[in-house]
Amino acid sequence: MKFISWNVNGLRACVGKDFESQFKALDADFFCLQETKMQEGQLDLKFEGYESYWNYAEKKGYSGTAIYTRHQPLSVSYGMGVEEHDHEGRVITLEYDNFYLVTCYTPNSQTELKRLDYRMTWEDDFRKFLKDLDAKKAVVVCGDLNVAHQEIDIKNPKTNRRNAGFTDEERDKMTELLNDGFTDTFRYLHPEEVTYSWWSYRFKAREKNAGWRIDYFLVSDRLREQITEAKIHTDIMGSDHCPVEVDLAL
């Protein structure tokens, strides 16, 4: 099964930049989107053979997630069941016979780390949410997790040390999650590869490949042997992020 995840940084804008042909070319079983930045009814985007599920932020033009799937789920849930976190459209979970698929758009800690304290609360609650799912069946979790985990995952680690997305606190929370039974699929297959998934729109960052790897597929450790491929599609444009992929023998 082929899974794709892409922070589209505004789906309506991305549709104007060839999204539909990219979607069809990637030909995924599951296509997860983050930062859709839209409300219900603003875009009617259907693909033959796919059902879609949407979680919208209450605030207009902000956050939001979606999943297109070729496989009818047993159940669908939105958010993580924590009132504090469930107003921004950040999480969707699809349940299948032998796994859960979770897509997530993790809150950014923002300039001057204004939202870092909230981010720490989110991290603990999201980790508990995933562990509770994992106790029932295996989990595939994807999305913009808004952290470059190790120095290999960011072009300029020294100058970004206290910037949102590369603080010790955020990196430690990712380590905690992985230590609690999850595997970073790309790093598992490609331990030394330097590839990024996000580039600032400023300073010609993408042209210079001054990027960050902040988009992930994580799987329950017991799915490790079923990871057949993990890719980052750096050639696909349309957003400041590019799509990431995992193929699993499920």
Regions found by a protein language model. Give the residues of each.
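N-terminal, active-site-proximal structural segment of metallo-dependent hydrolase catalytic domains
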Residues: 1-47, 51, 57, 62-63, ...
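Active-site-proximal beta-strand elements of phosphoester/diester hydrolases
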Residues: 1-9, 98-110, 142
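Active-site beta-strand/loop signature of hydrolases that rely on acidic residues for catalysis
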Residues: 7, 23-41, 101, 130-151, ...
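Structured beta-strand-rich core segments of catalytic domains in phosphoester-bond hydrolases
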Residues: 37, 42-109
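Metal-dependent phosphoesterases centered on the DNase I-like endonuclease/exonuclease/phosphatase
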Residues: 51, 125-210, 214
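Conserved beta strand-loop-helix elements of the APE1-like EEP
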Residues: 60-75, 193, 205-225
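Active-site beta-strand termini and strand-to-loop segments that position acidic
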Residues: 70, 94-97, 220-221, 246-250
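Surface-exposed cleft-lining segments at the edges of enzyme active sites
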Residues: 81-82, 107-123, 158-162
